[in-house]
C-alpha cells in the first residue's frame, strides 16, 4: 500500500515507526483536501453551487463515519482533538455526575486526555474517585522465571468490576492503552458493568485502537466513544460518538441561545466542524476502497465495478489489517524471547494486542536509544506519551522507547527494527579495565591539530571544547559519520547535565582516515571482542559514539574535568584516549570497583588508551592546572 503514500515514497530509506503519534497520509486524503479548497470552500446549507457541494460532502462524511463505527443509534460530534472533545463532554456531564455524589472510575494506564477532565470534576465536587490500576507483579517474580514474568503486568477485569456499585456514574476505559498495546474486551466489560448498574455510563477512548481494529459502537452498547483520524491515515479531526439515550442530560456548553436546543451538535460542537479536515475523510474512504481492491475484495475483482462502502467492506478491511499486523506481534515476541536485555511493557497473557511496543533496556537510556535509531533511519519516539500516571506507578523515570507500526509497514522494516534493537545489549562479563600504550608518543599532527577546531561546550563552565559523532565502524578503513546525533545522558549517570539534549558539532570527517584515530578505534574494538570471546559471546560491533574533548586553562586555578564526580557513563564499554598533554599537571584517571573503592590510578600520556567495563567499574579524573 506504500504506493499511495507520498511521504513514504519520498523518504523511502526511512522506516516510519512512530505511527501511534500520528500516521502518514495517503494521496487520496491530500487530493480531497485540495478538491475542497478549490470547489467547496464555503459555508454549508447555502444556495450557491459551492455551498451545495460542501453540504453534500458533509452528508457523505457522516455516512462514512457512521458506517465505519456501525453507528445506528447515536450521533457523531466532530472536533480538533479527542482531548478537547472529552474536556467538553466532561463539562457537559458535570451536573449529571455530581447528583447524589456519583462515583467515577478511571484507569491509570490510559492516555491522560480521558482522565484529567473527570479527575478535575471529581475533585471540584468532592466526588468519590476510584482508580483501576494495572497490576504490577514484578516484585513477586523471579528474574529467571519466565513463566512468572509472563504475568508481570496484568489488566484484571475483576478488579474493575469490583469497583462498580449502585452509585457509579461513569467508567472510563481505553480500548487500547497507548503504552501497553493490549486490546480490552470492551463489549464484555460494558455488559458486565451494566449488569451491576444499568445506569452507569461508559466512555471508551478508541484512539490507539482505531488504526488496527474494527469498531462497533452499536454492538458494544457504549455510551461514548472517541477516536482520532490522524492516527489512521487522516488529518487532525476527531470524533465523539454519543449514544442517543445520553443526550437528554448533557448540558449546553456553547452559546447561551443554544440552551433550549435539542440539537446536541449545537450544544457540544464548539465552533462547528473543521470543513477542510472533515472533507479529507472522503479521501480516507477512497483509500480504504483501494485497500480492499488490493486484497481482491470479492466485489472489486472487476476494477471497473463500483464498490459500496458498507459494513461488509469495513469488516473485510480490518480483518486484513489485524491478520497482517499480528505477524508484527509474533516477530517482536521472538525478539523479546531471545533478548533478555529488552523488556516490552505489556500484558503477556492471552490478551490480543496491536503493534505498539513500549520498550525498556537494561543498560541504555531510552531517549539515547531513540536518538540513535532516528539517525539510523528508524523514526521511533521516546517519553511518557501522556501516560505519566502509569510511568510513575511503575517507577519508570525517563519513559519508554515506543515502536508503533501500521499496515503500511513491511516485514523487512520490522526485521530491520528488531536487528537494530538487538545492538543495545548489556554484557555481564568479568573484564574490568585495560591500559594500552603501544601508540605512546606517536599521535599524528593531524589528529592533534583537529582539537583546536572544536566548538565551545556550552554545557560546562570550565574551558572545554567538544565534538561528538555516531560512527559506523563496520569497515575500519571506511569509517563513516552517521547523521547529526544529539547527545543525551540520564541523570542516573550524569548529575550535572543529565536528562537534557546536548548539541555538538560532528567531529572532523578528515580524522576518520587518520592512522592514529583508526588505531584507537581498532584497539578499542579488538579489546572488547577479545573479552567477549573469552565469555563465549560472539558479536560484531557496528556502531560507536565518539567524543572529542579538549580542556585547557590559562590561569593557576584548577579546572575540574569531571564535575559529576565518581560515575559511570551508561554504556557497556568506554575508552579514554589521550591525544596530547601540554603544560598541565593533574588529569589523573581513577578507576573504582562496584562499591566505589579505588582500584587503580594512572595519568594517561600522549597516545595511551584506557578501556573500561562501564557496567562494573566507575571512574573519575582529577582536575588540571598549569604546570
Q: Where do the model's predicted regions map?
A:
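Short, flexible loop/turn elements at secondary-structure junctions
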Residues: 21, 110, 208, 407, ...
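Catalytic core of Fe(II)/2-oxoglutarate
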Residues: 587-627
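Conserved hydrophobic/aromatic beta-strand scaffold that supports enzyme active sites
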Residues: 239-241, 356-358, 470, 565, ...
Amino acid at each position: 500500500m506504500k504506493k499511495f503514500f507520498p511521504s513514504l515514497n519520498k523518504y523511502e530509506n526511512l522506516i516510519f515507526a512512530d505511527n501511534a503519534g500520528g500516521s502518514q497520509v495517503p494521496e487520496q486524503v491530500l487530493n480531497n483536501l485540495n478538491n475542497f479548497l478549490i470547489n467547496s470552500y464555503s459555508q454549508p446549507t447555502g444556495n450557491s453551487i459551492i455551498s451545495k457541494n460542501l453540504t453534500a460532502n458533509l452528508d457523505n462524511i457522516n455516512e462514512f463515519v457512521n458506517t465505519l463505527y456501525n453507528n445506528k443509534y447515536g450521533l457523531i460530534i466532530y472536533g480538533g482533538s479527542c482531548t478537547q472533545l472529552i474536556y467538553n463532554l466532561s463539562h457537559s456531564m458535570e451536573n449529571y455526575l455530581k447528583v447524589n455524589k456519583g462515583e467515577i472510575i478511571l484507569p491509570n494506564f490510559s492516555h491522560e486526555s480521558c482522565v484529567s477532565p473527570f479527575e478535575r470534576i471529581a475533585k471540584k465536587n468532592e466526588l468519590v474517585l476510584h482508580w483501576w490500576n494495572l497490576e504490577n507483579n514484578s516484585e513477586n517474580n523471579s528474574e529467571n522465571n519466565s513463566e512468572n514474568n509472563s504475568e508481570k503486568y496484568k489488566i484484571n477485569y475483576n478488579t474493575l468490576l469490583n469497583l462498580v456499585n449502585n452509585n457509579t456514574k461513569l467508567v472510563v476505559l481505553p480500548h487500547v492503552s497507548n503504552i501497553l498495546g493490549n486490546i480490552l474486551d470492551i463489549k464484555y466489560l460494558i455488559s458486565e458493568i451494566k449488569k451491576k448498574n444499568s445506569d452507569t455510563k461508559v466512555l471508551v477512548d478508541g484512539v490507539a485502537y482505531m488504526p488496527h481494529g474494527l469498531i462497533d459502537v452499536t454492538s458494544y452498547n457504549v455510551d461514548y466513544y472517541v477516536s482520532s483520524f490522524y492516527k489512521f491515515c487522516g488529518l487532525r479531526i476527531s470524533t465523539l460518538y454519543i449514544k442517543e439515550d445520553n443526550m437528554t442530560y448533557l448540558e449546553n456548553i456553547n452559546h447561551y441561545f443554544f440552551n433550549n436546543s435539542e440539537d446536541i451538535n449545537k450544544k457540544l460542537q464548539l465552533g462547528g466542524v473543521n470543513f477542510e479536515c472533515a472533507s479529507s475523510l472522503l479521501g480516507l474512504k477512497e483509500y480504504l476502497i483501494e485497500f480492499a481492491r488490493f486484497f481482491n475484495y470479492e466485489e472489486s475483482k472487476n476494477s471497473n465495478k463500483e464498490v459500496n462502502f458498507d459494513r461488509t467492506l469495513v469488516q473485510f478491511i480490518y480483518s486484513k489489517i489485524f491478520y497482517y499486523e499480528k505477524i508484527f506481534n509474533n516477530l517482536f515476541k521472538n525478539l523479546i524471547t531471545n533478548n533478555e536485555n529488552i523488556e516490552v511493557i505489556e500484558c503477556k497473557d492471552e490478551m490480543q494486542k496491536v503493534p505498539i511496543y513500549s520498550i525498556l533496556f537494561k543498560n541504555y537510556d531510552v531517549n539515547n536509544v531513540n536518538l540513535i535509531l532516528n539517525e539510523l533511519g528508524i523514526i521511533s519516539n521516546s517519553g511518557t506519551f501522556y501516560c505519566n500516571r502509569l510511568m510513575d506507578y511503575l517507577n519508570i523515570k525517563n519513559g519508554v522507547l515506543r515502536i508503533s507500526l501500521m499496515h503500511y509497514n513491511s516485514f523487512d522494516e520490522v526485521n530491520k527494527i528488531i536487528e537494530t534493537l538487538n545492538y543495545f545489549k548489556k554484557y555481564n562479563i568479568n573484564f574490568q579495565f585495560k591500559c594500552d600504550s603501544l601508540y605512546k608518543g606517536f599521535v599524528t599532527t593531524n589528529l592533534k591539530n583537529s582539537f583546536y577546531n572544536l566548538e565551545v561546550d556550552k554545557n560546562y563552565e570550565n574551558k572545554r571544547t567538544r565534538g561528538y559523532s555516531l560512527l559506523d565502524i563496520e569497515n575500519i578503513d571506511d569509517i563513516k559519520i552517521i547523521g547529526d546525533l544529539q547527545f543525551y545522558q540520564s541523570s542516573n549517570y550524569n548529575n550535572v547535565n543529565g536528562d537534557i539534549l546536548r548539541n555538538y558539532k560532528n567531529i572532523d570527517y578528515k580524522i576518520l582516515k587518520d592512522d592514529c584515530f583508526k588505531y584507537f578505534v581498532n584497539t578499542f574494538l579488538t579489546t572488547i571482542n577479545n573479552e567477549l570471546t573469552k565469555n563465549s559471546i560472539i558479536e560484531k560491533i557496528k556502531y560507536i559514539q565518539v567524543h572529542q574533548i579538549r580542556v585547557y586553562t590559562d590561569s593557576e586555578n584548577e579546572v575540574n574535568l569531571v564535575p559529576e564526580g565518581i560515575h559511570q557513563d551508561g554504556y557497556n564499554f568506554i575508552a579514554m584516549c589521550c591525544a596530547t598533554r601540554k603544560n598541565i599537571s593533574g588529569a589523573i584517571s581513577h578507576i573504582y570497583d562496584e562499591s566505589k573503592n579505588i582500584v587503580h590510578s594512572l595519568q594517561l600520556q600522549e597516545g595511551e588508551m584506557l578501556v573500561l567495563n562501564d557496567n562494573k567499574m566507575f571512574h573519575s579524573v582529577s582536575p588540571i592546572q598549569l604546570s
